[in-house]
Amino acid sequence: MPSMTSKVFAITGGASGIGAATCRLLAERDAAVICLADVSSTNFTSLQESIAKSNPSTLVHCTELDVRSADKVDQWLQSIVSTHGDLHGAANVAGIAQGAGLRATPTILEENDAEWSRILDVNLNGVFYSTRAQVRVMKDLPPGHRSIVNVASIAAFSHVPDVYAYGTSKSACAYLTTCIAADVFWSGIRVNCVSPGITNTPMLPQFEPKAKSLDAIKDMYRDQGYPTGEADGVARTIVWLLSEDSIPVYGANINVGACPP
């Protein structure tokens, strides 16, 4: 089991779902500092309390942040290094969903400009701004093991004639990650991607707005050959990539859960 003792981490989208599971697991692995950012502060207190129960020695700092703002992302990362003196790893989990089954064929004609821009702005631009800011601060730190993990999706592998903005944003996230990985590896920074399959998070119902219940969504995906996984399973892969146990892996896009071939 990799230890994160004395290490500092930054997590976007860290207040719920996969991001929160990653924060909790980092604390269980004895991380010194977890700086999480999320567009909503609703879950900050409850997450801090749950982490304090599992590991009171882990410092958790919460920031309300919209990853669509490059300037605010830069300021957040710079403040982490200024306050805590280091940044060993980061996971960029922030993202938004797009509902399926809402558009008539040909679905491309109902993919409107506003939704396209909104989803790409968070799921792609947000990852770009965050990764760039993380590399910017990491490259000036003393030599050491540093790792960045971006979260894409099963949609990066599939070719569904719907939810164009979401699928495109996640495919682009995976491509961007691979390119950055090749660019910064020689600077001592490993960059990888995780592509979760169907995962039981608060965002799951947003992908299937016509479904009557969460169980109905799970049954539908199971019938298609896609069992529903849990956020903790994705978090274990993210934390492994953030740890020294995953050296020398870089530029990978790891599927977690069921995925099309």
UniProtKB/Swiss-Prot annotation:
Subunit: Homotetramer.
Family assignment from sequence similarity: Belongs to the short-chain dehydrogenases/reductases (SDR) family.
Keywords: Alkaloid metabolism, Glycoprotein, NADP, Oxidoreductase, Signal
Top-level class of the enzyme under EC nomenclature: oxidoreductase
Pfam families attached to this UniProt entry: adh_short_C2
Role description: Chanoclavine-I dehydrogenase; part of the gene cluster that mediates the biosynthesis of fungal ergot alkaloid. DmaW catalyzes the first step of ergot alkaloid biosynthesis by condensing dimethylallyl diphosphate (DMAP) and tryptophan to form 4-dimethylallyl-L-tryptophan. The second step is catalyzed by the methyltransferase easF that methylates 4-dimethylallyl-L-tryptophan in the presence of S-adenosyl-L-methionine, resulting in the formation of 4-dimethylallyl-L-abrine.
KW Repeat (keyword) present: no
Active site as annotated: Y166, K170
Organism from which the protein derives: Claviceps purpurea
Pathway note: Alkaloid biosynthesis; ergot alkaloid biosynthesis
Catalyzed reactions: chanoclavine-I + NAD(+) = chanoclavine-I aldehyde + NADH + H(+)
UniProt protein name: Chanoclavine-I dehydrogenase easD
Residues the record marks as carrying a glycan: N43
GO terms for biological process, alphabetical: indole alkaloid biosynthetic process
GO terms of molecular function: oxidoreductase activity
Range of residues in the leader sequence: 1-20
Name of encoding gene: easD
EC number(s) on file: 1.1.1.332
UniProt: NADP(+) binding residues: I18, D66, R132, Y166, K170, T201
